[in-house]
Design a protein with these regions (language model features):
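Thiol-based oxidoreductase modules, predominantly thioredoxin-like and allied folds used
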Residues: 22, 43, 66-84
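Local sequence-structure signature of Cys/Sec-based thiol-disulfide redox active-site neighborhoods
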Residues: 30-65
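Non-catalytic, surface beta->alpha helical segment in thiol-disulfide oxidoreductase systems
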Residues: 94-137
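N-terminal leader/targeting and pre-domain segments
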Residues: 1-36, 133-137
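Amphipathic alpha-helical interface surfaces
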Residues: 45, 50-58, 70, 82, ...
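Short acidic (Asp/Glu) patches
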Residues: 83-97
């Protein structure tokens, strides 16, 4: 685990635009067990592709007119229990951080894995999310 003071700005990068932090398994269950509505979950990370690509893309997507009911985040490598619980909902995809998942009515409907984030500009990833929002939100 990294020191919390190192991770705080990475957390705030998302919470400052309305993402709800899920810090423990109970937080995850409270949000993802709901069977109505849409939820975007960003699996945050300290890696460079989270900073350069995933978080900026997630932030850009919050400005779209058609959007999920809830934007939420877990922090891989920091909030171990919450991340493990969130990943239970992301099957059949293997653990991936960063990653971005969209749920509708309790079902996983769209997933962006790390290998779809690395090397792609934030705008391209955001467009992928926006297309998913247009389809599911």
């Amino acid at each position: 685990m990294y020191p919390e003071e190192l991770c705080m700005p990475m957390r705030e990068d998302l919470t400052s635009v309305g993402f709800v932090e899920m810090r423990d398994p109970e937080d995850v269950a409270e949000i993802l067990d709901k069977k109505e509505g849409t939820v975007l979950v960003m699996v945050n990370s300290v890696c460079g592709c989270a900073a350069a690509n995933a978080r900026p893309a997630a932030k850009i997507s919050t400005n779209h007119s058609k959007r999920p009911d809830v934007f939420a985040t877990v922090f891989a490598g920091q909030d171990i229990g919450a991340t493990a619980k969130a990943r239970e909902y992301m099957h059949p995809y293997p653990p991936s951080s960063p990653s971005i998942a969209l749920f509708k009515d309790g079902n996983l409907v769209h997933f962006i894995e790390r290998h779809h984030i690395e090397g792609r500009p934030a705008e391209m990833i955001a467009e992928n999310l926006i297309q998913a929002f247009n389809s599911y939100c």
